[in-house]
Amino acid sequence: MNSQNIRIRLKAFDHRILDASTREIVSTAKRTGANVRGPIPLPTRIEKFTVNRGPHIDKKSREQFEMRTHKRLLDIVDPTPQTVDALMKLDLSAGVDVEIKL
């Protein structure tokens, strides 16, 4: 039989929501009889923004903000049709971006 993998990539700003969603996906996949590799933590993307504190003067006075994007990778090896159905019906948190590649 041809081995097929499902690769799931998750992104979120809050790592706690991301880890909870990852646990949900792993438990659903294992419950339906699939083999799961991961979660593999990928590098966190950090974007920094520097802005002036004052509206028109004091170039030396600045403030920095940062936005962190956390990422995880899951591989589901040899998924059953029940696994695919269960993953499609799974309701994850609103702050998690999910990319699925077959």
From Swiss-Prot:
UniProt keyword annotations, A-Z: Ribonucleoprotein, Ribosomal protein
Molecular-function GO terms, alphabetical: structural constituent of ribosome; tRNA binding
A single Gene Ontology CC term: ribonucleoprotein complex
InterPro entries: Ribosomal_uS10, Ribosomal_uS10_CS, Ribosomal_uS10_dom, Ribosomal_uS10_dom_sf
Any Pfam family matching the protein: Ribosomal_S10
Annotated transmembrane regions: none
Biological process (GO), any one: translation
Family: Belongs to the universal ribosomal protein uS10 family.
Subunit note: Part of the 30S ribosomal subunit.
Function: Involved in the binding of tRNA to the ribosomes.
Matching HAMAP family: Ribosomal_uS10
Full protein name: Small ribosomal subunit protein uS10
Organism: Bartonella quintana (strain Toulouse) (Rochalimaea quintana)
